[in-house]
């Protein structure tokens, strides 16, 4: 028994008073008596005998240098102290984005998501999944389809990067018989390098050749050179792209590449509250980060990706699909459909290696979207757009700071060029209590003097003033 812990008799008395009639967990607290019982049960007399098959050379000679036991209060205090060293995006003005968005999630979302009907460690892929869970998954699919303007959606991917990579391999499977250059896929040069890296990991082992499509100086896709992609299996572009640019020319890209080449578009899902969805201007597959709906940005924690497509790709698309059907009594019923595409059915013929997906997080996204509704989404997108241009106008007035792509249309993000290294500017602003953005030199070495400024619905005039003051103070001191 740990020194200072309550005795078994005390715990049993308290449990009895509370009406508890099960076995108390106190039996699981380590003690020598229980150790002897367990050894006796398996026919051994000592711990050394239990571990006798482990070679002496790999055994630890000294006990682990663990700290002494602590009370619950002490543990919580230590945890708070350690967590206090983290930078909280909500405790200071933050203009950091570059893929994940700071957002407001209504409190009803986590409240509903933590109900026992949803919160489970079990991945819902078996036929006996409850009708309530299946309907919620189907509602998510419906919302995503309406959002991007395409008829088919799955129940989420891991994130935007894996969704993009899976979209490309799916397109090659479907279009290879029609394409004149079936093993080639063209990718915009203004795709975040980490996403391009994931795409390469998915494609290089299956013989798919990636070719890069260049952009003009204003950040728009070079449509003349894009015509060379006609005949390939797919073209992948993003709207907005990695620099936050909304490229109007992309709306004519499908006409340029033709029907034999799949057009895959990565989106900022919130932007679709303002801009026309890609499904309306020829996209065959739409992917994106679902994170702005349902969950805040995480440092390695779970998020989810969206994946929607036309019916042409239905039987070879990745991920779980819920269909609406009729049961034997003629009532509406929901069911997992086309499951033979998935690896838990036929691993060697599966269209994807995704299995344990992001269903719970995706359902949180569906809850968030349902609370917003179409009008709420439009207002949210408008607020973000307004914040983007307000911040842009303010920072470009600072001497020595200029917009990288002047004249373009932007959503959520834009890039500025500085009179010195972006990493120095960020360090200076951090010392002033401002998270000033993302150093684009981390993505492209030639842009080491550029910052990607991210904006969200929570940006205030005070935040903008703090950014201008901090960036202006650094810029004025650069020689």
Predicted ranges, named:
Residues 375-469:
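Conserved C-terminal alpha-helix-loop-beta "cap" of PLP-dependent enzymes
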Residues 26, 162-335, 416-419, 423-429, ...:
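Conserved PLP-enzyme active-site core in the AAT-like
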Residues 25-38, 42, 46-47, 54-58:
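Compact, charge-rich alpha-helical regulatory domains located at protein termini
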Residues 125-129, 146-165:
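Short loop-beta-helix segment that forms the pyridoxal 5′-phosphate
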Residues 9-24:
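Short, Lys/Arg-enriched N-terminal segments with co-localized hydrophobic residues
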Residues 59-139:
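N-terminal entrance/gating region of PLP-dependent enzymes' catalytic architecture
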Residues 115-127, 145-150, 180-182, 203-204, ...:
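Gly-rich Lys/Arg/Thr-decorated short loops/hinges at beta-loop-alpha junctions or inter-strand turns
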Residues 293-399, 404-407:
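Active-site C-terminal subdomain of aminotransferase-like
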């Amino acid at each position: 028994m740990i020194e200072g812990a309550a005795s078994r008799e005390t715990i049993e008395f308290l449990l009895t008073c509370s009406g508890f009639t099960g076995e108390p967990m106190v039996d699981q607290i380590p003690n020598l008596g229980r150790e002897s019982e367990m050894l006796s049960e398996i026919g051994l007399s000592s711990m050394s005998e239990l571990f006798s098959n482990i070679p002496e050379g790999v055994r630890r000679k000294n006990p682990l240098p663990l700290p002494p036991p602590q009370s619950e209060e002490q543990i919580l205090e230590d945890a708070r102290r350690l967590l206090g060293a983290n930078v909280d995006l909500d405790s200071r003005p933050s203009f950091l984005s570059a893929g994940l968005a700071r957002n407001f999630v209504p409190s009803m979302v986590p409240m509903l998501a933590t109900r026992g009907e949803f919160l489970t460690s079990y991945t819902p892929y078996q036929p006996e999944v409850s009708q309530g869970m299946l309907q919620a998954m189907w509602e998510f699919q419906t919302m995503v389809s309406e959002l991007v303007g395409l008829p088919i959606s799955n129940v989420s991917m891991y994130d935007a990067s894996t969704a993009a990579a899976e979209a490309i391999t799916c397109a090659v499977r479907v279009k290879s018989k029609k394409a004149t250059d079936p093993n080639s896929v063209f990718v915009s040069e203004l795709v975040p390098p980490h996403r391009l890296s994931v795409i390469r990991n998915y494609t290089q082992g299956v013989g798919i050749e990636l070719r890069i499509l260049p952009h003009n100086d204003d950040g728009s896709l070079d449509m003349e050179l894009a015509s060379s992609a006609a005949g390939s299996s797919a073209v992948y572009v993003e709207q907005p792209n990695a620099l936050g640019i909304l490229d109007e020319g992309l709306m004519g890209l499908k006409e340029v590449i033709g029907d034999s080449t799949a057009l895959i578009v990565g989106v900022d899902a919130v932007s679709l509250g303002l801009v026309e969805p890609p499904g309306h201007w020829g996209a065959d597959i739409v992917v994106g980060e679902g994170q702005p709906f349902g969950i805040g940005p995480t440092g390695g924690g779970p998020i989810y990706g969206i994946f929607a497509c036309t019916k042409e790709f239905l039987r070879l698309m990745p991920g779980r699909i819920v269909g609406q059907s009729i049961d034997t009594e003629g009532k509406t019923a929901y069911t997992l459909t086309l499951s033979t595409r998935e690896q838990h059915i036929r691993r060697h013929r599966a269209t994807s290696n995704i299995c344990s997906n992001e269903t719970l997080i995706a359902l949180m996204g569906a809850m968030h979207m349902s609370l917003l509704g179409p009008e709420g989404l439009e207002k949210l997108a408008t607020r973000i757009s307004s914040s983007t241009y307000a911040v842009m106008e303010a920072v470009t007035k600072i001497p020595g700071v200029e917009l990288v792509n002047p004249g373009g249309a932007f959503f959520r993000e834009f890039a500025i060029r500085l009179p010195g290294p972006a990493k120095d500017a960020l360090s200076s602003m951090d010392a002033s209590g401002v998270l000033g953005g993302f150093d684009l030199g981390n993505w492209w070495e030639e842009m080491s003097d550029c910052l990607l400024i991210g904006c969200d619905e929570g940006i205030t005039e005070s935040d903008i003033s703090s950014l201008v003051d901090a960036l202006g103070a650094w810029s004025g001191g650069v020689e």
